[in-house]
Amino acid sequence: MAKLTKKQKALASKVVAQKLYPLQEALTLAKETAIAKFDESIDVAVNLGVDARKSDQVVRGSVVLPAGTGKSVRVAVFAQGEKAEAAKAAGAEVVGFDDLAAEVKAGNLNFDVVIATPDAMKVVGQLGQILGPRGLMPNPKVGTVTMDVVTAVKNAKAGQVQYRTDKAGIIHATIGRASFSVESLESNLKALIDALAKAKPASSKGQYLKKIAVSATMGPGVRVDQSTVVA
């Protein structure tokens, strides 16, 4: 394990391990521990009471963060005809079908989100080995396989984030940047937690939201008192 620098040790000392902080105080600490020269992400880790080994307990979906992500998103859409024109009008940077598939196969992936109409999945399905490992494969569960390409493009541009439990049943997501106000980060985190609550699997028993922690990219984790998050 790499040794902490003096500056990192000083930052870590600001945060009391295992202490539960009220949400606004936790976010303030996360912002204060972001000292890199770039605008660090503010991330959240949510431990869920699910058995991620069971397919019916995998929590997956998407949510539009009200204050956005602070990131400019390039969108690619696989569609034809009217849907292709609608996607372009909605602001998609890259729109195509077989021609776009050829670009992807050639290694030209100059986009952050991929959306597809259902009929395009016969083409997109052949790109799984390229798109899948990069987290770009369209999926109806997160709203990226849809006939409503206009809404999908607008959501992606507006700050939609996708989430999925990892093998340990933890959701990792970015809720903004260190330059965001505490209020903006708070509204984004609450929107994510609300979405996760609605996505609770019917087979999940016991406590569902087990632990919430926020952190800057290079900063220590700050545990959040859940009573200050969930109404």
From Swiss-Prot:
Summary of the function given for this chain in its UniProt record: Binds directly to 23S rRNA. The L1 stalk is quite mobile in the ribosome, and is involved in E site tRNA release. Protein L1 is also a translational repressor protein, it controls the translation of the L11 operon by binding to its mRNA.
Signal peptide: none
Keywords: Repressor, Ribonucleoprotein, Ribosomal protein, RNA-binding, rRNA-binding, Translation regulation, tRNA-binding
Protein's gene: rplA
Family of this protein: Belongs to the universal ribosomal protein uL1 family.
Name this protein carries in UniProt: Large ribosomal subunit protein uL1
Alphabetical list of PROSITE patterns matching this protein: RIBOSOMAL_L1
InterPro entries: Ribosom_uL1_bac-type, Ribosomal_uL1, Ribosomal_uL1-like, Ribosomal_uL1/biogenesis, Ribosomal_uL1_3-a/b-sand, Ribosomal_uL1_CS
